[in-house]
Regions:
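Gly/Ser/Thr-rich phosphate-binding loop
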Residues: 60, 82-90, 99-169, 178, ...
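Conserved beta-loop-beta connector loops within the AMP-binding
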Residues: 176-205, 241-242, 304-308, 342
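AMP-binding/adenylate-forming catalytic core of the ANL superfamily
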Residues: 80, 88, 208, 213-214, ...
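Short beta-strand->loop structural element characteristic of the AMP-binding/adenylate-forming
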Residues: 12-15, 42, 64-70, 137
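Acidic/polar alpha-helix N-cap and adjacent early helical turns
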Residues: 349-359
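Conserved AMP-binding/adenylation subdomain of ANL enzymes
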Residues: 22-39, 47-87, 101-102, 183
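Conserved AMP-binding A3 loop
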Residues: 1-23
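Active-site glycine-centered loops adjacent to acidic/histidine catalytic or metal-binding residues
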Residues: 118, 141, 174, 235, ...
Length: 359
């Protein structure tokens, strides 16, 4: 039993099977290109999705584990150099810490395969990793799928693209991993596949040996999650003509303002392009005129100063005006033990005392 991290509410016990964990570990070894000469640096907590099964995957191929007691960006750079690390997994928040480290230099992570997931990485972070020589791979998955269920597999023809276009391609969630090659779909309400037009939004569903057996002692939640024989992730996505999936938002996180749907992820990506912003989170808050409106919660980089109106105008110049945050609040963001931002905590704070929530 492995517990979810609690980014959308109370953690739930996820029932794993030995077969599922075994197959996922082998799949991760194949997808990551692990071998007996691999050295894996741990920044991902081993308790989170069982370390995406890398605890077993690295061991199965005879690779080397290098463990961190606490995530310190400066120490990461030192250990990469000292142990000639070849692989590491890291949440987007860890990548942001590395980008902001005083030890950043061109080629500092040369030859290191970095796998990231948990939230769509900002294009700015992707560009920073590339400048340091890292080979960044974006994964998508949940505790319920033993970790990664898709990977943004890098294509050879991307090499000729600009860094901006490469970042855009790599920030997508990608195609199913080896163990779920026919088990991940994006479906409409009738469970039919959405067209591969990069526009039609559906829900990501999964089925296979590396999908959980159910929620521990919660048959109601298990039945709800497996409607139609597929596990419903609650994540909304489109499918591009090349078959790559791109998340647009979680069902719970879509902001409905004046009848318009706003993707909180889209606004967050734009906020992360601002040079002063280290981290950003956007939630819908009560609005008397529009029902709800986007509000941004941001953490600034050390030494930077910026006003809320400057951030709002930055977004208005690059997004449709109704998508730009109406408010901006500065300060640390609530996070889980794995470094994921807890949107529901911010949302509940903002909706406290209101009769209902919209969206």
């Amino acid at each position: 039993i492995d517990y979810t991290s609690g980014t959308t509410g109370e953690p739930k016990g996820v029932e794993y099977t030995g077969r599922g964990a075994y197959l996922n570990a082998l799949g991760q070894a194949l997808d990551a290109g692990l071998s007996s000469t691999s050295t894996y640096l741990w920044t991902l907590p081993m308790f989170h999705c069982n370390g995406w099964c890398y605890t077993w995957a690295v061991t199965a191929v005879g690779g080397t584990h290098v463990c961190l007691k606490h995530v310190n960006p400066d120490e990461v750079f030192l250990l990469v150099a000292r142990h000639s690390a070849t692989h590491m997994c890291a949440a987007p928040s860890v990548l942001t810490m590395l980008e902001a480290s005083r030890m950043v230099s061109e080629g500092a992570l040369s030859g290191v395969k970095i796998f990231t997931g948990g939230a769509p990485p900002a294009p700015r972070v992707l560009r920073a990793m590339q400048s340091m020589g890292a080979e960044l791979h974006h994964l998508y998955g949940l505790t319920e799928t033993y970790g990664p269920s898709t990977i943004a597999a890098v294509q050879q023809d991307w090499a000729g693209m600009s860094i901006e276009d490469q970042a855009r391609m790599k920030s997508r969630q990608g195609v199913p991993v080896t163990t779920l090659h026919v088990g991940v779909r994006v479906v409409a309400d009738d469970m039919g596949d959405v067209p591969m037009d990069a526009e039609t939004i559906g829900e990501v569903v999964a089925r296979g040996n590396t999908v959980m057996a159910g929620y521990y002692r919660d048959p109601k939640a298990s039945a709800s999650a497996f409607q139609g024989g597929w596990f419903h992730t609650g994540d909304l996505a489109v499918v591009h003509p090349d078959g790559y999936i791109e998340l647009k938002d979680r069902k719970k996180d879509v902001i409905i303002s004046g009848g318009e749907n706003i993707s909180s992820v889209e606004v967050e990506k734009m906020l992360m392009e601002h040079p002063a912003i280290l981290e950003a989170c956007v939630v819908g808050v009560p609005d008397e005129m529009w029902g709800e409106a986007p509000k941004a919660f941001v953490t600034l980089r050390d030494g930077y100063k910026v006003t809320p109106i400057e951030i709002i105008n930055f977004c208005r110049e690059r997004l449709a005006h109704f998508k730009a945050p109406r408010e901006v609040k500065f300060g640390p963001l609530p996070k889980t033990a794995t470094g994921k931002i807890q949107k529901y905590v911010l949302r509940e704070q903002e909706w406290s005392g209101h009769d209902r929530k919209i969206g």
